[in-house]
């Protein structure tokens, strides 16, 4: 019975991602993947497939594996990034880049890749993708250029450089926290595989699109100026930079990362409220920021955690772990992780792998690499892919599952192997 419920839940989640990503109830659109996972988890509880005390112990545990702490960390960090987006910081930076690079598609292509890579390192891949995709679509339409090279480049850059720092992706946070890997240790290990992966992925991107980039950009297109409240910008940047620095030294000052991010996200709301009161401006930015936070991840991650606990309780997790540990852990966990992520999504894959027994620390880092690069192999690989495909439809850009996977396999497989080989050499 437990296996039947789990397999059915996973199949339905994949089908929802591919065929009905959103459910519309009156005027409210809800992502379909999390209610399915929630129903699956509830069925496991109702059929006594997993003891309730096991779940309570896991959710109240005072350790790094506690999924509630990890969710608080990620959502709090995302709020800091969303705030800067609402202020207009990312659009402002993008506009400045376009003005400097306008005229040459090749320069624009390279410049946007570098800019998106840089911003992703210190914020979140999901936020960067959601911010830059509308901008690229709008600019390409008005400049009469093909948006596909820039959109794919943006998506690849964001999901490659998201593995550079621990804060770049919820999967990084989850796996690192589960095995007590701190900010500095993570950075020391992952920076080189990230750089190599970036060089390989960008080289393939350039080879794929170099002919299309020879067309000149319509230089007469004027970019609309973005007005930014400097006070709000300073507040946002201060909180993001300070949080990142404190996360980097969290293990040395003995403060848990989730407490730092929660404290600064609350401080951001309080400081902004005080500033808005003094300046007599609307509180809209706070409400808009909080409204955009990825709350759907809460039921999804908690439900998948229950499903994985059931698999662990049934002995299936240890069987998969034993199988992957039989060969070289870097390549078995890296390739195996990417395959599993593209079957069940990278967040459930990370929850599953966090419950495994790793033969070495290399296995953990290989799993992190897999969880990031899996995002651009198929749309199923990550929530970012699902959101991105949905966003393209709203801008009437025809980019099918087949086309996504075709580009994803061409770029993703060499990039994954290059990153894993680098990890194998250095670790």
Locations of the language-model features?
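Alpha-helical transmembrane segments of multi-pass membrane proteins predominantly involved
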Residues: 129-130, 179-182, 365, 369, ...
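Hydrophobic alpha-helical transmembrane segments
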Residues: 7-17, 53-54, 102, 131-147, ...
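Membrane-embedded alpha-helical segments and adjacent helix-loop junctions characteristic
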Residues: 56-145, 283, 296-360
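Hydrophobic alpha-helical membrane segments of integral membrane proteins
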Residues: 125-132, 152-153, 260-263, 377, ...
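Helix-loop-helix module between adjacent transmembrane segments
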Residues: 77-85, 103-104, 115-125, 157-165, ...
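Hydrophobic residues within alpha-helical transmembrane segments
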Residues: 111, 115, 156, 191-192, ...
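Hydrophobic transmembrane alpha-helices of multi-pass small-molecule transporters
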Residues: 1-82, 86, 192-198, 202-313, ...
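Membrane-core helix-loop-helix motifs of multi-pass transport proteins
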Residues: 1, 139-212, 216-228, 234, ...
């Amino acid at each position: 019975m437990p296996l039947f419920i789990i397999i059915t839940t996973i199949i339905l989640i994949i089908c929802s991602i591919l065929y009905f990503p959103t459910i519309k109830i009156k005027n409210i659109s809800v992502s379909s993947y999390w209610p399915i996972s929630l129903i699956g988890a509830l069925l496991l509880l109702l059929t006594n497939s997993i003891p309730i005390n096991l779940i309570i112990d896991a959710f109240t545990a005072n350790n790094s594996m506690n999924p509630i702490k990890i969710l608080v960390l990620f959502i709090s960090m995302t709020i800091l990034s969303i705030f800067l987006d609402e202020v207009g910081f990312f659009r402002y930076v993008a506009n400045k880049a376009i003005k400097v690079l306008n005229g040459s598609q090749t320069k624009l292509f390279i410049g946007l890749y570098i800019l998106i890579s840089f911003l992703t390192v210190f914020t979140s891949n999901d936020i960067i993708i959601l911010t830059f995709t509308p901008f690229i679509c709008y600019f390409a339409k008005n400049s009469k250029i093909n948006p596909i090279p820039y959109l794919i480049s943006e998506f690849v850059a964001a999901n490659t450089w998201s593995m550079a720092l621990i804060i770049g992706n919820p999967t990084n946070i989850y796996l690192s926290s589960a095995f007590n890997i701190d900010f500095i240790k993570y950075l020391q290990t992952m920076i080189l595989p990230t750089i190599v992966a970036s060089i390989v992925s960008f080289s393939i991107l350039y080879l794929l699109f170099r002919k299309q980039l020879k067309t000149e950009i319509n230089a007469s297109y004027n970019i609309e100026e973005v007005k930014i409240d400097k006070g709000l910008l300073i507040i946002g940047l201060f909180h993001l930079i300070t949080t990142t620095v404190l996360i980097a030294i969290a293990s040395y000052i003995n403060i848990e990362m989730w407490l730092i991010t929660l404290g600064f996200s609350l401080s951001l709301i309080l400081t902004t409220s005080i500033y808005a009161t003094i300046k007599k401006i609307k509180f809209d930015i706070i409400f808009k920021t909080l409204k955009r936070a990825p709350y759907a991840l809460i039921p999804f991650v908690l439900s998948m955690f229950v499903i994985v606990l059931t698999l662990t309780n049934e002995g299936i997790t240890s069987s998969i772990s034993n199988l992957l540990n039989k060969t070289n852990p870097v390549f078995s966990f890296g390739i195996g992780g990417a395959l599993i992520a593209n079957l069940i999504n990278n967040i459930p894959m990370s929850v599953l792998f966090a419950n495994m027994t790793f033969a070495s620390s290399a296995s953990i880092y290989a799993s992190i690499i897999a969880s990031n690069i899996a995002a651009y192999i198929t749309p199923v690989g990550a929530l970012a892919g699902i959101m991105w495909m949905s966003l393209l439809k709203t801008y009437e850009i025809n980019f099918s599952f087949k086309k996504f996977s075709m580009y994803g396999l061409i770029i993703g497989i060499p990039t994954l192997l290059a990153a894993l080989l680098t990890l194998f050499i250095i670790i």
